Amino acid sequence: MAQRRLRLIIGITGASGVVYGVRLLQVLREAEVETHLVISRAGQMTLAQEEPQLKLAELHALASRVYSDQDIGAAISSGSFKTAGMIVAPCSVQTLSAIATGVTTNLVSRAADVILKERRKLVLMLRETPLHLGHIRSMAEVTEMGAIVYPPVPAFYPRPAAVDEMVDHTIGRVLDLFDIETGLVSRWQGMKEKSATRPREPAEDEDAAAFTQPGQRNPRGPRIS
């Protein structure tokens, strides 16, 4: 029997950061991973706001299969439809809350609920800040159920030069959770040692300049008020 391609469900919701969902689909397509996409109505609104140059049909074309968020009878709503898991990118607090309570409101939360009951991998790229206690409790509840809450917090040790590099690194780390190698991650190799040098002693006039009175301009810093 021929080995089936890796299959993932991708959910896109109305939280800011739709670029994560778009880039995720692009990378998975390049990796020849079978993707099943469902984007909520709020997600479609966010797509139009944040990525106006990308038409909805073009986003759909990145996926292997696309479902309406109201299609509760879709294949991905059943546990018998085998997948490696699901990634919600980005994940809104509303979607997080629906998953935490098990009261599913659309196909995104229903598919996520199925992933949890089948003990498959669910990754939620939660995009919200600051968080109140209810959000934190929902995060704890889905974690106890087996989900992985993965806020897309950028890494700075690779010293990214552009937002695209931050997005790529984050997507690469998320796909690490599914053992999908993308080549997008700058792997940490340990702290680089710097040659020990004795700090230069400041000159007397520099010491004097460092201490200014309120209202005066400090030549080594911003105006003190």
Where are each of the predicted segments found?
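A cross-family phosphate/adenosyl-ligand binding-site feature
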Residues: 1-123, 129-225
